[in-house]
Swiss-Prot record:
GO MF terms held by the record: DNA binding
Family affiliation: Belongs to the TACO1 family. YeeN subfamily.
Top-level taxon of origin: Bacteria
DNA-binding among keywords: yes
Biological-process GO terms, alphabetical: regulation of DNA-templated transcription
Keywords: Cytoplasm, DNA-binding, Transcription, Transcription regulation
UniProt-listed InterPro entries: Integrase-like_N (IPR017856), TACO1_YebC-like_2nd/3rd_dom (IPR048300), TACO1_YebC_N (IPR049083), Transcrip_reg_TACO1-like (IPR002876), Transcrip_reg_TACO1-like_dom3 (IPR026564), Transcrip_reg_TACO1_YeeN (IPR026562), YebC-like (IPR029072)
NCBIfam families reported for this sequence: PRK00110.1, PRK12378.1, YebC/PmpR family DNA-binding transcriptional regulator
Assigned GO CC terms: cytosol
Key word ATP-binding present: no
Name of the molecule in the record: Probable transcriptional regulatory protein BC_0539
HAMAP family on file: Transcrip_reg_TACO1, Transcrip_reg_TACO1_YeeN
Length: 239
């Protein structure tokens, strides 16, 4: 699959460590998930996914509780979930998922992040067909064979199970996210190193050094935007 998931997560977390930006993004996502459904994760699958992801980033309980209470309190603050697609240097493909309360601002900010870094925004569907929605679950303390056996016994399907350094990474259909976690928890797994619903490129590309530097600058500019929740791409950054 070409992605070292723990490295990617650690890089994102360290980049945001001093500003708590990642916590703010999770706070917004938790609020939206809780407001759109029940504020109880047992009956709100979208909220459960966000909370499981938040655990892997060590999001403080106070951030989570504040977002849920805000949703419970009937806040009138509304966010739209919007997806933008575009191209970076050398035609690299990028998907940007946002939560925004000002569509015009977000569209302008995303377009500027692309255009200022040798990229350009595309139309809906211009790159998404080259990505697959995927659940990615990572854990330690088991081998890939052991994980396969656990999932088979629980009658849970996975697309792929790979070993990455000290972790095992499970790739599955998005609707299998909770089933994979439940099966593993039932087998004694208490913590997950990765818990993501992502858009996974069907094939990765490698960029020349100068183009990769420009591409990473563009991704950083996109991730720095307040309204941007996730940036997906098809570039192998060698992480």
């Amino acid at each position: 699959m070409g992605r070292k998931w723990n490295n990617i997560k650690d890089k994102k977390a360290s980049k945001d460590a001093n500003t708590s930006r990642i916590y703010a993004k999770f706070g917004r996502e938790i609020y939206v998930a809780a407001k759109q459904g029940e504020p109880d994760p047992e009956s709100n699958q979208a909220l459960r996914v966000v909370l499981e992801r938040a655990k892997t980033y060590n999001v403080p309980r106070t951030i989570i509780d504040r977002a849920v209470e805000k949703a419970k309190g009937g806040s009138e603050e509304n966010y739209d979930e919007l997806r933008y697609e575009g191209f970076g240097p050398n035609g690299a493909m990028v998907i940007v998922d946002t939560l925004t309360n000002n569509v015009n601002r977000t569209a302008a900010d995303v377009r500027a992040a692309f255009s200022k870094n040798s990229g350009n925004m595309g139309v809906n569907g211009s790159v998404a067909y080259m990505f697959d929605a995927t659940a990615v679950i990572g854990l330690e303390g088991k081998t890939s064979d052991e994980v396969l056996e656990i999932l088979m016994e629980a009658d849970v399907d996975a697309r792929d199970i790979l070993e990455e350094e000290d972790s095992v990474i499970v790739y599955a259909e998005p609707d299998q996210f909770h089933a994979v976690q439940s099966a593993l928890k039932g087998a004694g797994v208490e913590e997950f190193t990765v818990a993501e619903l992502t858009m996974l490129a069907q094939s990765d590309v490698t960029l020349p050094e100068d183009a990769q530097a420009q591409f990473e600058k563009m991704v950083d500019a996109l991730e720095d935007l307040e309204d941007v929740q996730q940036v997906y791409h098809n570039v192998d950054l060698g992480e």
